[in-house]
Amino acid sequence: MPTESGSWAAARQTKQKRKSHSLSIKRTNSSEQDRPGLQREMLEGQDSKLPSSVRNTLLELFGQIEREFENLYLENLELRREIDTLNDRLAVEGQAIDGAELSKGQMKTKASHSTSQLSQKLKTTYKASTSKIVSSFKTTTSRAICQLVKDYVGHRDGLWDVSVTRTQPVVLGTASADHTALLWSIETGKCLIKYVGHAGSVNSIKFHPTEQIALTASGDQTAHIWRYMVQLPTPQPTADTSISGEEEVDFSDKDENDGDGDASSDCPTVRVPLTALKSHQGVVIAADWLVGGKQAVTASWDRTANLYDVETSELVHSLTGHDQELTHCCTHPTQRLVVTSSRDTTFRLWDFRDPSIHSVNVFQGHTDTVTSAVFTVGDNVVSGSDDRTVKVWDLKNMRSPIATIRTDSAINRISVSVGQRIIALPHDNRQVRLFDMSGVRLARLPRSNRQGHRRMVCCCAWSEDHPTCNLFTCGFDRQAIGWNINIPALLQEK
């Protein structure tokens, strides 16, 4: 995960810079006698420092390439003419054969061949038509059950994490590579608080269970605890964002800067944390509160996770054992349990229920980086990986998963709803899919040229009790999105 802000913008600027300095060559159909004129035309306006001999050699090579393409084009035209002639001849011969008397063997052979062709044609047509009907039905159903409600736009770089407060008023928090964390009004999409205390990418954000305090992890090798006070604005009527099936077209190259105003420029700013946790020697990739909110855990690229006392900022435990960088950490909602994920293809369960000793269990089952592992209500852990799978584990039987979900793209920071235990999967390929704990696919969030994410989706977060939006997603297209998932209808379609 990049630690410097502007990483996506820098990549775009570099790409544009390379494009502006690329050699411009005009397409022309010219003979050998026209080559000097062609050379002059191609070199017009070019501020080249190459010697004349080198330029002439390059132009001659380009000329040879052009001639080869011309020859291929002519050969292609000739082949097309021959194919058309053969098709016409076959049509005439087929009509003549149909009018002639055939022997029993010939008739059997022809009938078998014709039947096979007809069967194959019908099969292909039926399969394509059925696929379109099913795809259209699924799209319509998903759109009715999963509706986009609000876009949260204001960051200047990609978003790594999204979270919802557990206290009133309920607000949305986002962590971005632009070195800031923002708090948003869920109803209006207005930025309420801007935190600028970090000197690196803000990689995660989590809220205190009982107070208006946030915990953020950063690429500056620290985690910050900071207080916020928000007053919600009056919600305004929102326009209908639903689209018809005919408009469900993927314009994936649409620039993420389109309509991208600086919504955070006029919101109150918090610059100094209450405390900073500074024991790591590498990027702090994630952080979370232990139950009760008196301790916090952090995960770092230095291959360790640290447990801190929030009041004193003192390091209580350093959790070692992972062989590679950590990618995520998560705490149990009601027990003193922590799960850490790593690039070493494992995740580990740390038990702090006994103050005198903490135990650790290693979960092995993935073949690539474990991007996140989260607790569910009960005795389950759900893990997601770059190996394109999600696995559901029973804490009482850690040898093998009880369910495996196989997908077509790497999975990032997953979220499991509390009530119905629905797993939300954010993908590298810009999709967000919903599954149940048995691995049954429930829905795919709609995505088109008018709505949805246009870049990698990094994180999902459920907020089931909110009346407007009960699922949030964020991605590297610099925006967070609030969705309304009709959970009863979703489960009824199961």
From Swiss-Prot:
Which sequence ranges form a coiled-coil region, renumbered to this chain? none
Cite the InterPro entries for this sequence. G-protein_beta_WD-40_rep, WD40/YVTN_repeat-like_dom_sf, WD40_repeat_CS, WD40_repeat_dom_sf, WD40_rpt
Q: Bias category Polar residues: which stretches?
A: 22-31
The entry's keywords = Cytoplasm, Nucleus, Repeat, WD repeat
The residue intervals holding the WD repeats read 154-194, 197-236, 279-318, 321-360, 365-403, 406-445, 452-493
Quote a single Gene Ontology cellular component term: nucleus
Which residue stretches does the UniProt record annotate as biased composition, category Acidic residues?
245-263
Predominantly, its location class is: cytoplasm
- Is Acetylation set as a keyword in this record? no
Q: Where is this region: Disordered?
A: 1-38, 236-266
| UniProt-annotated location(s) | Cytoplasm; Nucleus
Name of the protein described by the UniProt record: WD repeat-containing protein 37
State the organism of origin: Xenopus tropicalis
Source taxonomy lineage?
Eukaryota, Metazoa, Chordata, Craniata, Vertebrata
